[in-house]
Amino acid sequence: MNALTAVQNNAVDSGQDYSGFTLIPSAQSPRLLELTFTEQTTKQFLEQVAEWPVQALEYKSFLRFRVGKILDDLCANQLQPLLLKTLLNRAEGALLINAVGVDDVKQADEMVKLATAVAHLIGRSNFDAMSGQYYARFVVKNVDNSDSYLRQPHRVMELHNDGTYVEEITDYVLMMKIDEQNMQGGNSLLLHLDDWEHLDHYFRHPLARRPMRFAAPPSKNVSKDVFHPVFDVDQQGRPVMRYIDQFVQPKDFEEGVWLSELSDAIETSKGILSVPVPVGKFLLINNLFWLHGRDRFTPHPDLRRELMRQRGYFAYATHHYQTHQ
């Protein structure tokens, strides 16, 4: 564990009881908490939002906050402060969330509503150019001919931050499992910056703060390059990161070699967590100090996994990039 921070006591340690949901530390790390909505809360939430189809949430953005309020009210208004406290806490910053009884692809619309409610209790999800909505759903199959590693099943998708090739601030990332068939492997991979044993070395390197060019492939529907450094700091001077190996474009030999060594140092870290995410569950992480990726799948001709993502900004705190706006 890096000396910059240590895992601190949190709400889980205090034995506090919550209304409408439970909270426990995960098996993988005390930094990752598991939040489960009770069967009653789930049932009441879905009943109260049934009048709005997903299309209504797409067309009327204020409804995304309305469904969030409904969920928080069902949890005695304990949910929103807990989410914010956890995600903004450097010692944690990650949740694995599920709702009892929501675990089948036939409930895909209900999954989108639930994830939308949670996300809009902490901020607002950004427009996703790949899908043209505030969320994106995409499928991983046994054969893939796309232009990035997002849908390629038989290789590791390396650890990275989201939002590196767009100008919008990306404070959080939400990744939900909607469907899974004939699937072995493919766990989510997570790495907290303060558990990365090489952080000090790379954060203090002269290239860490040099603005670099990030460019996305055609499938992302983003044509404008953006420039920013790989590392920045938060309000307290602690390292945060905006990095993805696929889309950073080194301008010269020096940058290329450094980025290659950086990638190797991340991928070989002993601090990487392997987290199974069953259908209906979703990860919600602070994108500034958690990196995420995906392990490889075992090949199968009928392999299928459908995912939903949302990524956006925290509405209850200034963003954490301090030196490069």
UniProtKB/Swiss-Prot annotation:
It holds the Pfam family CsiD. Its EC number is 1.14.11.64. Binds 1 Fe(2+) ion per subunit. Keywords: Dioxygenase, Iron, Metal-binding, Oxidoreductase. It catalyses: glutarate + 2-oxoglutarate + O2 = (S)-2-hydroxyglutarate + succinate + CO2. Acts as an alpha-ketoglutarate-dependent dioxygenase catalyzing hydroxylation of glutarate (GA) to L-2-hydroxyglutarate (L2HG). Functions in a L-lysine degradation pathway that proceeds via cadaverine, glutarate and L-2-hydroxyglutarate. This is Glutarate 2-hydroxylase. The gene is glaH.
